[in-house]
């Protein structure tokens, strides 16, 4: 009886101490949006972007946050292949073929 109690207690302790996988994003990855490398990142209300928004038919008042300009996707992070010689950002909307990306947040690829 004492042996059975010991076995049950030991198994319960092992089960409680077993590590579980955490679903946290890796360094240099985006929890929302896509990882992009943009030549410049500017505020949406920047005067230099106003004419570009007009050409794309975007209403300036509807755009908030940071805007990436001339962006390309970063595909390999952490394997020595992720390089961005400009500004790495996570962007929510890159539906303008890399010309601009909307809703960007700067990130650090060197973590």
From Swiss-Prot:
According to the UniProt record, one GO cellular component term is:
extracellular region
Provide the disulphide bond pattern: 30-90, 37-84, 38-71, 91-104
Its principal location?
secreted
Which keywords annotate this record?
Cell wall, Disulfide bond, Secreted, Signal
**One term of GO molecular function:** structural constituent of cell wall
Q: Its domain of life?
A: Eukaryota
Q: Pfam families, alphabetically?
A: Hydrophobin
| Signal peptide positions on this chain | 1-17
Q: Where in the cell is it found?
A: Secreted; Secreted, Cell wall
The protein's assembly and partners: Self-assembles to form functional amyloid fibrils called rodlets. Self-assembly into fibrillar rodlets occurs spontaneously at hydrophobic:hydrophilic interfaces and the rodlets further associate laterally to form amphipathic monolayers.
| Primary role | Aerial growth, conidiation, and dispersal of filamentous fungi in the environment rely upon a capability of their secreting small amphipathic proteins called hydrophobins (HPBs) with low sequence identity. Class I can self-assemble into an outermost layer of rodlet bundles on aerial cell surfaces, conferring cellular hydrophobicity that supports fungal growth, development and dispersal; whereas Class II form highly ordered films at water-air interfaces through intermolecular interactions but contribute nothing to the rodlet structure.
The similarity comment for this entry is: Belongs to the fungal hydrophobin family.
Q: What is this protein called?
A: Class I hydrophobin 10
Q: Which organism is it from?
A: Pleurotus ostreatus (strain PC15) (Oyster mushroom)
What lineage, starting at the top, does this entry show?
Eukaryota, Fungi, Dikarya, Basidiomycota, Agaricomycotina
């Amino acid at each position: 009886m004492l042996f059975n109690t010991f076995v049950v207690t030991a198994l319960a302790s092992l089960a409680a101490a077993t590590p579980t996988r955490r679903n946290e994003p890796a360094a240099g990855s985006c929890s929302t949006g896509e990882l992009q490398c943009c030549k410049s990142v500017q505020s949406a209300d920047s005067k230099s972007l106003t004419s570009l928004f007009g050409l794309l038919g975007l209403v300036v008042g509807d755009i908030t946050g940071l805007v990436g300009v001339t962006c390309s996707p970063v595909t390999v992070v952490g394997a020595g292949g992720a390089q961005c010689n400009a500004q790495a950002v996570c962007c929510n909307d890159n539906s303008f073929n890399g010309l601009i990306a909307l809703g960007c947040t700067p990130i650090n690829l060197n973590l």
